[in-house]
Curated annotation (Swiss-Prot):
It comes from the Eukaryota. SUPFAM superfamilies: ARM repeat. Pfam families: Noc2. This is Nucleolar complex protein 2 homolog. InterPro entries: ARM-type_fold, Noc2. One of its GO terms (molecular function) is transcription corepressor activity. GO terms for biological process: cell differentiation; gonadal mesoderm development; negative regulation of transcription by RNA polymerase II; ribosomal large subunit biogenesis. It is found in: Nucleus. Residues 25-42, 643-661 have a biased composition (Basic and acidic residues). It comes from Caenorhabditis briggsae. The keyword Nucleus applies. The gene is pro-2.
Amino acid sequence: MKLLKKSSSLKKGVTKRAKLQKKPPSKDEASSSDEELAKLDGEGSLDGNESEEDDGTVQVEKGGMKKHKLDLEALKKSDPEFFKFLQQEDADLLNMEEDEDDDEEGEDNEDEEDEEEEEESDEDDDEEDDDKTKIKKIRKPKVKSDSSGRLIVDSNVYSYLQQVLVLDDETTTPINPSDVRMAIDVFVACVARVGADIEAPKYVINEQSIFEAVVRMCFQAMPDVLKRLLKARPDGEKVLFSKTMIKKYQTYVRTYLHAMIVFLNEVQTTEVIIATLKAITRLVDLYAHFSRMSKLLIKAIVKIWSRKTLECRLPAFVCMNLLVKNYPQHFVPLYKTAYVAFVANSKVVTNETWPLLQFMHRTFAEITMINPEQAYKYAFVYIRQTAVHLRNAMIAKGRKDLIFSIYNWQMMQCMYMWVRVIAKAHSVNGAEQIGELVYPLIQVIVGIFKLCNAPTFLPLRLHCCQMLIQLQASCTNYIPIMQLSCDCLEELARELKSKPKPAKGAVKLPDIECTLKCSTQYSDLPQWRKTISEHVFRTMMQSAHLLASQAAFPDVALPINHRIATILDTMKNADQAHLFRGFQTKLKEHSRFVLDVLARKHVDLNDEMQVRAVRFDLNNPDSPIKSFYRQWEKVWKMKEKSALENSKKDDKKKKKEEEAAKKRKATETLEDDDDEDAKPTIPKAKRKRIKIGAAAKRADATVPDQFADMSLANWSDED
């Protein structure tokens, strides 16, 4: 009964406490309510060891748990029915032990969870610290300014830019646009230091080491930085950029791209030009997005491709090829600019410039094959333009200016280049249209050959024969080169009729490959006649070697033999006559060889297999013409090697002489300076004044003034 009273009092206390909590107490009632709550807590405790929380749950302290258990056991023994009633109605009074155990376990679990959360929070703090160290903002250095107000780039600025821009992890590291802008402004200062005519930049660089370090850093880091800033993504060989980012940062990008082009135009050192071109090649995808920048880039790289050394021209061609290959819209302006630049820079041909011109021939042919459909339109127009010049010169033969508009290196180099382009087109699929231009090109070259028959232009006619040989070898078209070479032989025979005039002393002859016209001072020399006859013989051998495997060789060689025989009858020089007679005998032997092969086999022209079998038999390496050609080819190679060695020796001698002359001048200037310094200063002696008499003062009117021509009116620097 006592327990029932206690439980009922507990319930009454809980309800009363809830009511007191719902009503907000006033200031007067606050102290009384606290006392009542304290009394309620005291009334509901079991022997001072039990308390009740705000939610009505009972908490029993550990000290009164044993006594509570003993009371429950005594109640169970004394009144089992009431104990069952308590189990059904108020089981919380009986389950105090289990609740306490659960509370203890819960406290233990909460302690463990708190420990785990503390450990995890510590780990998270460590990770955050690591991230902060990774994405740690670097303080911008304080930049000093000079007297004009421009900011000075020193080692602190360079180290800051290097830490910000040169980053290993590209994905996680963000890029600050202000840092990119600062780097671009610093590079513009480098461009101004080179000597470019631009506005005064924001920054200025005074140290050469800082200048070189900044340029190197921009070349290495800026392409990747701009790609990350513009959110670039690869698309095959091209790189695509975000349109929104390009619109947002186009002023930055255009400034840097223009600065790179200005820097490329200003520098002159080969190593710096190559490094700049490599950096620009990494930015080609970015240049292609801006039409004005792409035009400036085309002008700059074509200028290097046509004017600089071979080491510089190669990376320029790589940049040109990449721009045209990935972005066809820039093909036409680049193609036009390259052709005009080639024509403008082919006026002078020497042994040093020939490799550069040949490089331009090959690279222009490669660019043509990238887009042959568009290139055909302009190739047709350019070849037609040369034909128009030739027609004007043929109509007015008496005008030397029109003849020399054809007989110059620009026209001949254009012919060489189109020969290379058409020869390349016959080996590339899809370039059939350009391959068809071989017919008008042959007509133009033959017209140039027949324009003027003067013996002084014999080297030019040999150049025309060499171009026709290249076309016939690559295009498999028959060209009457042997007849044209016989025309050269006739001119040579006319020149050999006159007696040679030996030179006085050692004379250096011009290289036939680098000359179009032979002057009269060389034409009468025996050394020149020997070299020109060897070149004529070589062209005749090459033209015969091209036809050696053709069944029509006897028919072509028959009139050639008669012409050579008549020409040799008039030739007085025994050495040259012996050279061409050997060629004539080989023509006869090879024509017999071809007739014997054709006589042994029955050939049906409609059967391709039989025709191929005959060509295979005629293409015998032991045939008379081919074996004879191999022997002479070895001789020609040996002569070319010796000529190259001699030219190298001459160049070395010239360099040594120039260096010695410079040293002499330097020593002479030093000696003159020393002599001037060593001259003693002699004090001038005071002159005694001589008294002039009255008779001496009177001037003689009969004596003329000897210094009249040195008056102020007639005196000038030119005199």
